[in-house]
Protein backbone atom coordinates (compact mmCIF):
# COMPACT_ATOMS: atom_id res chain seq x y z
CA UNK A 1 0.00 0.00 0.00
CA UNK A 2 0.95 3.63 -0.14
CA UNK A 3 0.87 6.44 2.39
CA UNK A 4 0.71 10.10 1.41
CA UNK A 5 2.73 12.92 2.92
CA UNK A 6 -0.24 15.30 2.72
CA UNK A 7 -2.28 13.38 5.33
CA UNK A 8 -2.63 15.28 8.59
CA UNK A 9 -4.62 15.58 11.80
CA UNK A 10 -5.45 19.07 13.09
CA UNK A 11 -2.74 20.56 10.89
CA UNK A 12 0.02 18.16 11.92
CA UNK A 13 1.33 15.77 9.29
CA UNK A 14 1.24 12.06 9.95
CA UNK A 15 4.47 10.30 10.88
CA UNK A 16 3.67 7.50 8.38
CA UNK A 17 6.18 5.19 10.04
CA UNK A 18 3.91 2.23 10.78
CA UNK A 19 4.04 -0.76 8.47
CA UNK A 20 5.60 -1.18 5.08
CA UNK A 21 4.55 0.26 1.80
CA UNK A 22 5.57 3.28 -0.21
CA UNK A 23 5.40 6.96 0.65
CA UNK A 24 4.05 9.34 -2.00
CA UNK A 25 3.39 13.08 -1.94
CA UNK A 26 -0.40 13.33 -2.27
CA UNK A 27 -3.66 11.40 -2.09
CA UNK A 28 -3.85 11.78 -5.88
CA UNK A 29 -0.49 9.98 -6.08
CA UNK A 30 -1.91 7.23 -3.86
CA UNK A 31 -4.73 6.84 -6.37
CA UNK A 32 -2.30 6.66 -9.27
CA UNK A 33 -0.29 4.01 -7.42
CA UNK A 34 -3.47 2.05 -6.70
CA UNK A 35 -4.53 2.17 -10.36
CA UNK A 36 -1.10 1.08 -11.58
CA UNK A 37 -0.96 -1.75 -9.05
CA UNK A 38 -4.42 -3.01 -10.07
CA UNK A 39 -3.62 -2.79 -13.78
CA UNK A 40 -0.48 -4.85 -13.27
CA UNK A 41 -2.49 -7.46 -11.31
CA UNK A 42 -5.03 -7.70 -14.14
CA UNK A 43 -2.30 -7.84 -16.76
CA UNK A 44 -0.81 -10.97 -15.14
CA UNK A 45 -4.14 -12.74 -15.73
CA UNK A 46 -3.70 -14.90 -12.62
CA UNK A 47 -5.13 -12.56 -9.99
CA UNK A 48 -8.47 -13.53 -8.46
CA UNK A 49 -9.10 -10.16 -6.80
CA UNK A 50 -7.82 -7.58 -4.37
CA UNK A 51 -8.98 -5.54 -1.40
CA UNK A 52 -7.93 -2.28 0.20
CA UNK A 53 -7.38 -3.59 3.72
CA UNK A 54 -7.73 -0.46 5.89
CA UNK A 55 -10.89 1.65 6.02
CA UNK A 56 -9.52 4.48 8.14
CA UNK A 57 -6.12 5.89 9.05
CA UNK A 58 -4.78 4.81 12.40
CA UNK A 59 -2.14 5.10 15.08
CA UNK A 60 0.78 2.82 15.85
CA UNK A 61 1.65 1.66 19.37
CA UNK A 62 3.60 4.90 19.93
CA UNK A 63 0.63 7.09 19.02
CA UNK A 64 1.98 8.13 15.62
CA UNK A 65 -0.54 8.33 12.79
CA UNK A 66 -0.21 6.54 9.45
CA UNK A 67 -2.13 7.14 6.23
CA UNK A 68 -3.45 3.66 5.42
CA UNK A 69 -7.16 4.23 4.99
CA UNK A 70 -9.62 5.59 2.48
CA UNK A 71 -10.79 8.01 5.18
CA UNK A 72 -8.80 10.07 7.67
CA UNK A 73 -8.65 9.62 11.43
CA UNK A 74 -11.59 12.04 11.54
CA UNK A 75 -13.45 9.88 8.97
CA UNK A 76 -13.13 12.45 6.20
CA UNK A 77 -12.90 10.68 2.82
CA UNK A 78 -9.82 11.12 0.66
CA UNK A 79 -11.87 12.06 -2.40
CA UNK A 80 -9.02 12.24 -4.93
CA UNK A 81 -7.80 8.80 -3.83
CA UNK A 82 -11.31 7.33 -3.79
CA UNK A 83 -12.22 8.70 -7.23
CA UNK A 84 -9.22 6.95 -8.77
CA UNK A 85 -10.04 3.73 -6.91
CA UNK A 86 -13.61 3.99 -8.18
CA UNK A 87 -12.46 4.60 -11.76
CA UNK A 88 -10.41 1.41 -12.00
CA UNK A 89 -12.87 -0.66 -9.96
CA UNK A 90 -15.78 0.28 -12.26
CA UNK A 91 -13.69 -0.60 -15.32
CA UNK A 92 -12.40 -3.93 -13.99
CA UNK A 93 -14.50 -6.16 -16.28
CA UNK A 94 -13.64 -4.27 -19.45
CA UNK A 95 -9.98 -4.26 -18.37
CA UNK A 96 -10.09 -8.04 -17.89
CA UNK A 97 -11.56 -8.39 -21.39
CA UNK A 98 -8.83 -6.12 -22.76
CA UNK A 99 -5.99 -8.10 -21.18
CA UNK A 100 -7.58 -11.42 -22.17
CA UNK A 101 -7.82 -10.26 -25.80
CA UNK A 102 -4.30 -8.84 -25.74
CA UNK A 103 -2.84 -12.14 -24.51
CA UNK A 104 -4.48 -14.12 -27.34
CA UNK A 105 -2.88 -11.98 -30.04
Task: Briefly describe each language-model feature range.
Residues 50:
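Conserved, mostly hydrophobic/aromatic
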Residues 44:
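Acidic-histidine catalytic/liganding microenvironments
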Amino acid sequence: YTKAEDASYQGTGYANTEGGGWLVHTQKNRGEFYQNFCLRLLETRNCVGWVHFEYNDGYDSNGKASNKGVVSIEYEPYTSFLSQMRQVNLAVHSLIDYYDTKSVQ
